[in-house]
């Protein structure tokens, strides 16, 4: 527990709803008058895009797989050290991975490269991480133990593949074949390093579409929030006022003793209502179980 300098992490693939989650947290920080230092998970990649392409080819020639989900392409040690340092001193460093030309041009760089490391702003009240590995645990590193509030954002897997396919082809210039190859290549790392994190979270938000996603690789568009439900799982029920949440979130219902289901369009509001009191508890120096 980092009582003086709490660490909040949202873990999940980009496009999974992490943007909605980040917006909800920023609203909460503003409402509580908190200054947050933000760290992006992509900044802990080991390789630039050309370097990663070369690493993939070398791994394939050697009969191995490498992906952005696993430790070979990410510096889990540096991520863990970042959380430790911030928890102890409120200090650290960050950089950005530039995915697109729009992101790269202001830095006079090309897509697929990193900005220089820079110190985190000071003073701040909380560290906010958004990325793939906020709750990762390996034999060498335990990132999850340094997180005070861990939130998982994960769609059902077919929806995740649809989001990846459409995002990577329309925004990042990849071919459909390259994206499908990436899905196959990433599966072992996804199973070993991504999915176990969602058993360590305090909360999970899982988007479930109500339209047919049986063949994600033939999808022409991403199901909208209004075409989805969001399944919210609570690890600990202490302080969770289900009757109040049901009254505030029209169309919501309880599907299990520790699970609330809300219409997709209510996802952002649900996050704000649920997480604001949790952030308040953190800032009061209380531990979230």
UniProtKB/Swiss-Prot annotation:
Annotated catalysed reactions: D-ribulose 5-phosphate + ATP = D-ribulose 1,5-bisphosphate + ADP + H(+)
Keywords for the protein's UniProt record, in alphabetical order: ATP-binding, Kinase, Nucleotide-binding, Transferase
EC number annotated for this UniProt entry: 2.7.1.19
The protein's enzyme class: transferase
GO biological-process terms attached to the record: carbohydrate metabolic process
Positions with a binding annotation for ATP: 12-20
SUPFAM superfamilies recorded: P-loop containing nucleoside triphosphate hydrolases
One annotated Gene Ontology cellular component of this protein: cytoplasm
CDD domains: PRK_like
Disulphide-bridged cysteine pairs: none
Molecular function terms from GO: ATP binding; phosphoribulokinase activity
UniProt cross-references to Pfam families, sorted A to Z: PRK (PF00485)
Transmembrane segments: none
Family, similarity comment: Belongs to the phosphoribulokinase family.
Protein's name according to its UniProt entry: Probable phosphoribulokinase
Native source species: Escherichia coli (strain K12)
Gene of this entry: prkB
